[in-house]
């Protein structure tokens, strides 16, 4: 991923989720290798994952709604420090606005996945725990659906905040 794509994809919005819920989440390894077998979750852990997915999905819907209504600056205002350390508000807003202008208005959006990742220091992505909400979105000026991604980072205060928004 190019630095500009990474910068454009980093942003934050508060989502409700507790640290104990994150502790129950299996994380994906950073390296591009097959994931180790995931541990079997207890029914209580699975219920926590399901609740967290619903909360994060609601938060992601708010983010895309703000982007859809040209309120991208508000997304940046609530972003994680991880995102704010990589891109300033003006760059974030102008990059997303330019990308969305090319695509036109969203016509249909379907959530296709909620994924979890953990990154260690020294990589292309800042260290930490992330949850991503992936949409297949049809836009007025795009013949095929576009992958729309909203990422959240678990900040030091144990609050999930938007760490990215990207289109591919």
Regions found by a protein language model. Give the residues of each.
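Bacterial N-terminal signal peptides that target proteins for export
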Residues: 1-7
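N-terminal signal peptide c-region/cleavage motif recognized by signal peptidases
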Residues: 14-16
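Short, low-complexity N-terminal intrinsically disordered segments enriched in polar/charged residues
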Residues: 20-69
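Acidic, low-complexity intrinsically disordered segments
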Residues: 51, 58, 62, 66, ...
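Short solvent-exposed beta->alpha transition segments
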Residues: 57-58, 73-130
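Exposed beta-sheet edge and beta->alpha loop/turn motif
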Residues: 115-168
């Amino acid at each position: 991923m190019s630095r500009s794509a990474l910068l454009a994809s980093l942003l934050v919005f508060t989502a409700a989720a507790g640290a104990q819920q994150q502790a129950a989440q299996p994380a994906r390894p950073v390296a591009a290798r097959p994931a180790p077998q995931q541990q079997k979750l207890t029914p209580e852990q699975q219920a926590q994952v399901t609740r967290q997915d619903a909360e994060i999905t609601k938060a992601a819907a708010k983010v895309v709604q703000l982007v859809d209504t040209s309120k991208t600056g508000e997304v940046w205002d609530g972003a994680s420090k991880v995102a704010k350390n990589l891109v300033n508000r003006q760059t974030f807003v102008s990059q997303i606005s330019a990308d969305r202008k090319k695509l036109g208005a969203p016509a249909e959006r379907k959530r296709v996945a909620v994924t979890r990742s953990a990154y260690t220091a020294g990589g292309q992505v800042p260290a930490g725990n992330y949850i991503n909400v992936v949409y297949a979105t049809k836009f007025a000026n795009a013949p095929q659906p576009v992958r729309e991604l909203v990422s959240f980072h678990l900040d030091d205060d144990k609050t999930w905040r938007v760490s990215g928004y990207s289109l591919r």
